[in-house]
Amino acid sequence: MFDGVFDYVVDATLRGGHGLFMGRIPNVWYGNQYSRSGGATDYNRFRSFSDTIGVMPAASVADPRFFWLGPTSDYQVRGAYFGDAQGTDPDFEAPSSWRSNLALDLVTANGYEITFEYNLDDVNEGVFYKDLGLERTGQLADGRGVYDTAGDYWLTNASGGGAEAFTWSINKNFNGLNALLAYSTVDAEDIYPLTSTQAESSYGYTQRFDGENLSPRPSSFMIDEKWIFSLDYTAKLIGENDTRFSLVYIRKSGENYSVTYDTGYNSVGGASYGGYDLAYIPTGAADPKVNFANAAVAAAVMDHINSGKLSNYKGTYAPRNAFQGPDYDRLDLRITQDFNVWNDHKLIVYLDVLNLMNLLDDQKGIVEEYSFNNSRQIMVNGVDAQGRVNITGVDPDDSLSVINFNGQSVWQVNLGFKYSF
């Protein structure tokens, strides 16, 4: 198919650019210091009736000052509902990155259109959350620190992270049949995935091993590899009217995810939410750094570890987003039929068969992901007197589920029309 592609080039374009880029500032980040002020407001108590509430500063509820606290308030202000006070570094800068792009477009004498493109993204100012009350109080047998936290989160900047992407594509028309083949690969890293508007959630839902000792890791939003193949053919099957067939196949890598301890509500390290402690991977049933509930549990856990990529991390912890979920592929078909009605008036009827693979086989074309890029595979019940995590079981497929909230894991048939004039 591609014989003679590079025999000679009739047109070549080199393009590129470099610059500092900043997106729209997410103002919601700044709102945390107002909604989590540590005691300047007492709305929660006011909403729920209490006899202890005395005279408020203003007499009329129509006056916004009715809800303000002041020296005339004769009741005791409790701590904030969330028990924390949050702030923003006065030198905080909105996220920005240096971006570079270089691309080469080629057209050959026999009609091939070929593109190579490279993109580099280097973080200039990233986002980092600190807990100003974080205090290391001990260490577990696996080496992770134990921390007391206050929940006083501080929005500040950090360097580190970025992305590299390489793409190539080949396009050619073969006597009415247009074919496209494209491939892209991405390597992207970040420190905080920043999936929440609230500071405590962005902080607590970031998988970690030891407190705030965080380094850039593969992004939760990265698609490692992606292939696209399409065929498009137009013929005149009904008089002089165009009949068009379009077929698009996509295959892409699964999302990154982390393997963590299933600890219930509480974290073993104290610096994250429960279930977001990165798992230490035992070397075997006799690993002195963990405590298995019994021999059967040890055998089940080690069988799971030895059966996959977890075995690469024996004797240490599995880093954040060190694993990939199942790959995904799908095939879409569109058929359109034009009907010339009168002069420039045209009726276009179209038929879409989305996820054709799932129509032919209900086990194909299914998107499977780990919820919030997190899989609590090692079940844990606290820590023993020697600082060893008590391992009670294993759940190899924890949080792995079929994603179908937009219908991406089922087939669909759409029939419609458009009238243009």
Model-derived regions: residue spans:
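Short loop/turn motifs that connect adjacent beta-strands in outer-membrane beta-barrel proteins
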Residues: 2-12, 110-111, 173-176, 236-245, ...
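Gram-negative outer-membrane beta-barrel transporters
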Residues: 117-259
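Outer-membrane beta-barrel "beta-signal"
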Residues: 407-421
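Membrane-embedded beta-strand positions of outer-membrane beta-barrel proteins
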Residues: 14-16, 104, 114-116, 170, ...
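Transmembrane beta-barrel domains of outer membrane proteins
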Residues: 1-5, 105, 169-173, 232-236, ...
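Residues that define the transmembrane beta-barrel architecture of outer-membrane proteins
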Residues: 96-98, 162-164, 223-229, 327-331, ...
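Solvent-exposed loop/turn elements at secondary-structure boundaries
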Residues: 3-154, 159, 274, 315, ...
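Extracytoplasmic gating/loop element in the C-terminal half of outer-membrane beta-barrel translocons
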Residues: 243-342, 373-401
